[in-house]
Amino acid sequence: MILFITGATHTGKTRLAQKLMEKYKIPYFCQDHLKMGLIRSHYTDLTPDDDQELTDYLWPVTREMAKTAIENKQNMIIEGCYIPFDWQKDFDEEYLRNIRYICLCMSGRYIDNHFDHIRSFASCIENRLDDDYCTLQNVRNDNRMFLNGCIQNHLDYTLIDDDYESAISPLMHIL
């Protein structure tokens, strides 16, 4: 079983992946690690700010890792924001039967009411060396983009609108 966890910045993707790994003893792969490894080793001229280009660059590798794990009957959680909204087109039905998808989105109201709290969790799993881009407007825009992408592509999503833990709690039973 493959579990894709995606969503906007600061929605808790890595934290959820970590909690699921601990509960189910399933490894997780973080697309940010692949991104930074490729950037720091100069295998690409892309920068961490090149979101769409990074999706185009990282998705083929991520996709084939998922297929390989399914073929080997292995479970894996793949976490990151570089999973395209049309990801399903890249998998035959035999693969799709073995893939679950979670997209975390926060409502504008939630962001407005909890922005300081959101920022306080920014490094709860991984240390963010530079979090200057995490502004109220950027977080709102990023979440709106992910929510619209899910709606337009008929993908399920988890909307965090009131209480974070009550929105995330059901996802702990997805596998």
State the predicted function of each range.
Residues 15:
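Conserved Walker
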Residues 5:
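Hydrophobic anchor at the beta1->P-loop junction of P-loop NTPases
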Residues 99-143:
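A glycine- and Lys/Arg-enriched "phosphate-lid" helix/loop adjacent to the NTP-binding pocket
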Residues 9:
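The conserved Walker
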Residues 12:
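Conserved glycine(s) of the Walker
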